[in-house]
Amino acid sequence: MQFSFSNDLGTLFTIILAIGFIINLVLAFIIIFLERNRRTASSTWAWLFVLFVLPLIGFILYLFFGRTVSARKLNKNNGNVLTDFDGLLKQQIESFDKGNYGTDNKQVQKHHDLVRMLLMDQDGFLTENNKVDHFIDGNDLYDQVLKDIKNAKEYIHLEYYTFALDGLGKRILHALEEKLKQGLEVKILYDDVGSKNVKMANFDHFKSLGGEVEAFFASKLPLLNFRMNNRNHRKIIIIDGQLGYVGGFNIGDEYLGLGKLGYWRDTHLRIQGDAVDALQLRFILDWNSQAHRPQFEYDVKYFPKKNGPLGNSPIQIAASGPASDWHQIEYGYTKMIMSAKKSVYLQSPYFIPDNSYINAIKIAAKSGVDVHLMIPCKPDHPLVYWATFSNASDLLSSGVKIYTYENGFIHSKMCLIDDEIVSVGTANMDFRSFELNFEVNAFVYDENLAKDLRVAYEHDITKSKQLTEESYANRPLSVKFKESLAKLVSPIL
């Protein structure tokens, strides 16, 4: 009997192609019919393009980046923690539907339709007894965070996309360990991909002192994570149920301006008051979704009575993630833009939204609203960077003023309208933040905060370069090619 190596190799190759074709057909069926309610049309077409242009590679990419998330599995350990807040949400919805807004705050009354929409989410209840401070520099922020950790009396909860155990990370971990020695409860929830250089073993001493640590969507396989595409991008700190932080700064030396991108410009909020309850609720839900030990239940110590009148800044906390069809933060941003009468100020390091969001911005600009968009001048993710610029032509021709921040890297995620309302948090203005990642933003109805952040934005403009229609039209052909390629796959970036 004679064997032909070339024939056998050809047969094997044919079999592999056939298997790949069958797998792609099955995946195409799943994407089109079984996951149609979880995907936009552009995302569906982008995945089909990848599957059929790169059959076997497309299958591997789908395993890591394409699968959807089960809400049932995420929420299975929530117990009774939502019961009291469901009642509060229902009460506020009924009151708003009757025109009873429960406050004399002018911005809440004026933008009651935005408030009502955000009440559709479990974190979205409106609170008014709040004092808000803002930070745009990482050194200032973490100096204050370390002071607040030192003054903690009962517990500290941290939830971070990136918790780097470098200089800053070690300082914070040491401060937390000191509080454990004093008998406080300390929990850390970090993202397994965002904190890719962190291992659970790095927290052995912390855990030996009584601290608890969980990794979000942790992989059991080294270097492989089948939830690569659905990351917990939230950055939250809660101290004693009285004080909370939320915003764009991660934990690491890079966010102090010590990384390769230079000065790090971001926006973060420090909140004292009733809105901390919403941040605490979000932390508990996220912890319960990942923990393998006894779960959080509702306990009054986690939602204590606040220390007297603190301020009059109405706040709603909005969360979004891939397990929900209701894209709370995207819709909140869009509603703000569509409600603007005078001005819109937007900052986002990654700007790759869908057409409906782009159209909302264009409609506002064409209606005479003064619309500003600030993006980075340098890439930390090249493909995302070029996709960001691919939307510039339509926006510029509609009258949107676009700036590229030149004084380092802008990582701020902010939407501000009419010097009246501002949203600050973790959600970039892109498909990933709107639909794939777990995000959290604060919507603050406070003219003083809005004006302060607008002044900070105007200072940023002095350190930026304005993009014009002429300069954009004259960009090199190689840049145009990169933008076109990036835009083609932007729904899955």
From Swiss-Prot:
Q: How does it sit in the membrane?
A: Multi-pass membrane protein
Domain PLD phosphodiesterase per the UniProt entry, residue ranges: 228-255, 406-433
The places in or outside the cell where this protein is found are: Cell membrane
Biological process annotations from GO = cardiolipin biosynthetic process
Q: Member of which family? A: Belongs to the phospholipase D family. Cardiolipin synthase subfamily.
The record, for HAMAP family, names: Cardiolipin_synth_Cls
For this entry, the protein name equals Cardiolipin synthase 1
Gene source species: Staphylococcus aureus (strain MRSA252)
